[in-house]
Amino acid sequence: MTDAEFNAAIERMIQGDRSGLRDVYDAYGNTIYRLFLGLVHRHQDAEDLTSEFFLKLWGCASTYRAGTGHKCWMNAIARNMAVDFQRKNREIPMEDAAEVYAEQQTSAETAEDEVIGAMHTNQILSRLSEDDREIVQLHLSAELTFREIASILKRPLGTVAWKYRTAIGKLQKLAEEGQLV
């Protein structure tokens, strides 16, 4: 979705037209879900947060300033929601593979593949510090640029790019040593 399309969708939302929200959801629903899944590590919580996110987006559409980067704005909202969620739920247990598989039994094979892929990705990323993992997830899952990530995290651009390269280097080294399955 381009900035112009997003701006038009926001304008429709402000006027009470749900089609604007539907367009934003269609364009970013999966991306926001993957971002939450990477941050909270539980499928049910990620789904709940995704629903809450779009309700919140509907309510705060009028606060968006055109030209400020809609992806950055949405990801800042999502990240803040995940941080608030984690504060309220300090103890966040990881789901085991059997539970995840059982939850996804009714879904199509592609959904099962997506769950397994997400579990594998989370397992791999768990080898990184929380700080590095967040940067990698924002860049790869949320498809944000380093500049957008720096803005969200309120860190220098060079630091974000360096931490990303260092994290990817660590993962490559672990893969070469056969420590990543």
Where are these regions (language model features)?
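N-terminal module of bacterial RNA polymerase sigma factors
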Residues: 1-31, 38, 126, 180-181
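Sigma70-family region 2
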Residues: 14-15, 41, 52-69, 88-89
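Structural recognition of an alpha-helix C-terminal capping motif at a helix-to-coil junction
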Residues: 34, 48-55, 59, 68-80
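Arg/Lys-rich amphipathic alpha helix in sigma70-family domain 2
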Residues: 62-66, 76-96
